[in-house]
UniProtKB/Swiss-Prot annotation:
This is Probable ribosomal RNA small subunit methyltransferase A. CDD domains: AdoMet_MTases (cd02440). Pfam families: RrnaAD. Specifically dimethylates two adjacent adenosines in the loop of a conserved hairpin near the 3'-end of 16S rRNA in the 30S particle. May play a critical role in biogenesis of 30S subunits. It comes from Methanococcus maripaludis (strain C5 / ATCC BAA-1333).
Length: 263
């Protein structure tokens, strides 16, 4: 079957990486697992041998022959023919996620996962995206994505995966990442406002926090002059001269709360 470029289909063929993903997810016979993208079923079959239940969300119904083969062999596999971004994940009751993600939906699907309860997710991403997810302050990988994902999950970069592990071979390297869901390590008063502050700051990651916020005041929906007044009012409580890329997530959370109290 010819894979769909539109759907970003690159099927994971290398069984070593399939096994690595499953091992790092620590799947047991008590786990209910969510997988995105059936492919030819290489990952699904291995999951089904161990897990209590496997839900697979797949959009491409041309893959039905593979689905029929798997569901006839494994009674614990259920295929959901739909767009993963539109499925209500809260009703599925899974506790783990293992998936080779379509790279064009990496960001929205990751944040959709983080909005629901799960224990562990072991996911395949484009290499550069994975590095940014795991980015730490004062590194070139540190980004808005780093702070947003690490707000309520621990991120572990497991390994780099070469194009040769897939069919067809993608043009980029990939990586396996493990997300462990947890409660936030710091408090923010309003998560939506926190995300707006993040966006405003990281549009200018090399500038000082003050300059970045003023230049992107529209992102936090505060008039530029009003924002200048607010920053002057709270400058005794925060160091606005620090560069954005050096600022820890905890400090950004604290700043978000300071600004939120003033609007």
């Amino acid at each position: 079957m010819r894979q769909s470029k539109k759907l970003g289909q690159c099927f994971l063929k290398d069984k070593n990486f399939v096994k690595k993903a499953i091992n790092r997810a620590e799947i047991t016979n008590k786990d209910v697992v969510l997988e995105l993208g059936l492919g030819e079923g290489a990952l699904t079959k291995e999951l089904a041998k161990i897990a209590k239940k496997v839900y697979v969300i797949e959009l491409d119904e041309r893959l039905k022959p593979f689905a029929d083969e798997i569901t006839s062999e494994f009674e614990n596999v259920e295929i959901i023919w739909s767009d993963a971004l539109k499925v209500d994940l809260k009703n599925l009751g899974f506790n783990k996620i293992v998936a080779n993600l379509p790279y064009q939906i990496s960001s929205p699907i990751t944040f959709k996962f983080l909005d629901v309860d799960f224990e562990t997710a072991v996911l395949m991403y484009q290499y550069e995206f994975a590095k940014r997810m795991a980015g730490k302050p004062d590194t070139k990988e540190y980004s808005r994505l780093s702070v947003a994902v690490q707000y309520n999950a621990d991120v572990e970069f497991i390994c780099k995966v070469p194009p040769s592990a897939f069919s067809p071979k993608p043009d980029v390297n990939s990586a396996i990442v493990k997300l462990t869901k947890r409660e936030p390590k710091y408090f923010v008063k309003d998560e939506k406002f926190f995300k707006k502050v993040l966006k405003a700051m990281f549009q200018h990651r090399n500038r000082t926090i003050k300059r970045a916020l003023i230049d992107s005041s529209h992102e936090i929906e505060i008039d530029r002059d009003n924002l200048k007044e607010i920053l002057e009012k709270v400058e005794s409580e925060f160091d606005f001269s620090e560069r954005v890329f050096k600022t820890s997530p905890e400090k950004i959370g604290y700043l978000s709360n300071l600004l939120y109290d003033e609007i």
